[in-house]
Amino acid sequence: MEKSFCSPLDITQIEQNFSEINPALTEAEALYEANRCLYCYDAPCTRACPTHIDVPSFIKKIASGNLQGSARVIFDANPIGATCARVCPVDVLCEGACVEKTLLQKPIEIGRLQRYATDHAMEGGKQLFTKGEPNGKSVGIVGSGPAGLACAMYLARLGYDVTVYERRALPGGLDTYGMAEYKMSQSVSQAEVEQVAQLGVRFLLNTKVVAAAPDDEVLGEINRVSFDLLQEWHDAVFLAVGLGETNKLNIPGEEMDGVVDALHFIEKVKTRDWKSVPLGKSVAVIGAGNTAIDAVTQAKRLGAERVTMVYRRSEKDIPAYDYEYELAKKDGVEFVWQAAPVGILAGENGSALSLRCEKTDGSLQLLDISCDMIIKAVGQQKMRSFFEKVAGVETDEKGRVVVNENMQTSKPGIFAGGDCVNGGAEAVDASQMGKLAAQGIHIALTGEDIRFAGDRQAKI
């Protein structure tokens, strides 16, 4: 970004702006909240959780002072339970289904109680599970996000030799690189990774899986390994590669300096090297999903003078969750509705000067929004090329990998899950798909049907 600025705020102010928006419960608060729970039989909160955490059980253990037991219940059903305690949309999942809410009372703060228990386990470095007796079988997992981590944990507990291939320097996927810093720091996802690593799972970082490459070819700091070799080395392969780069706008000026994508911006913020994050004085963010909200709020908290979110539909159509939208409004973000970007105009130095939009309210009026930085948050591309050319598996018309009920792809021995299958959902959904894939892999390799925590027939 040629015309680059950095945050005008001092480090102390920035640190304060990026402190977690939902602080941890104190012991007294946790005990009070846990004792409000009715411990429902066939609890609707458990049914509303995609990983089916036994919510009454873990809350009851908090009430009795058994925090390690509580954390075990959580991580048994969801290996990224600490992450989900912070980033899950609990108001539309577990807390949204709480019986107290149906009685017109305040729902139990399930998310914060979940954080209380999982923080206790991770801060104490407690290992909650043990590696299973080696069974002589090996599984390779491509990607270390929620789906990959979940699959790895369950397979390791069953005795599989598990290797995770991750193209980045740190494992954790979007939990590490893509969550707004005020929601969750990288230390949380790394603590969950450590839980999995302690089960004997190997993480090969800076390693990219490609169509064809010599064994362990090194290009710069990145190792390249061919997918064919993965199939030779392992009895099964699980693809948990998520989604690709941000979609293109396909408008004039998109390649100018000062135009960045939201994921790269958020990733830069995650380094916490605050003064190195390129930041315009006036920032326009295109899109209105949860990633767009993360971008506008973080730009504002870094000290941008003006931040505007631009969306082609009306306010009532905003795809972001209500609480995310309210946060952006509270932070002083401005909104332009029913405006579709049609071009980016340059200043004298060739960098972005304004975003030209066409009104979608029927007037076709042109609107220029002055800005010196534009952030694209318009969804991510599907990795169709990777799946068809590298892995050789079938994708649907939207570029999503086609799987059966056991998460197996069209190619025997190859499984897939997470955003690359569902097109992009919550971290908790990806975790559940990783769990289902581990079950499917075990069934395929041993013929033994097995169900993990969160299933009425759970066996481990």
Features from the language model and the residues they span:
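N-terminal Rossmann-like FAD-binding beta1-loop-alpha1 element of flavoenzymes
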Residues: 138-163, 292-300
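Residue-level detector of alpha-helix initiation sites
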Residues: 79, 145-147, 289-291, 421
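Feature captures the FAD/FMN-dependent oxidoreductase FAD-binding
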Residues: 133, 138-142, 190-251, 343-354, ...
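Beta1/beta-strand and adjacent pyrophosphate-binding region of the FAD-binding site
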Residues: 133-147, 279-286
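FAD-site-proximal beta/loop scaffold in flavoenzymes
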Residues: 255-280, 370-424
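Rossmann-like dinucleotide-binding cores of NAD(P)H-dependent redox enzymes
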Residues: 161-164, 168-203, 296-343, 448-460
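Conserved hydrophobic helix-helix packing surfaces used for dimerization/oligomerization
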Residues: 139-141, 162, 283, 307, ...
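Ferredoxin-type iron-sulfur electron-transfer modules and their immediate structural context
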Residues: 1-138, 239-255, 274, 346-352, ...
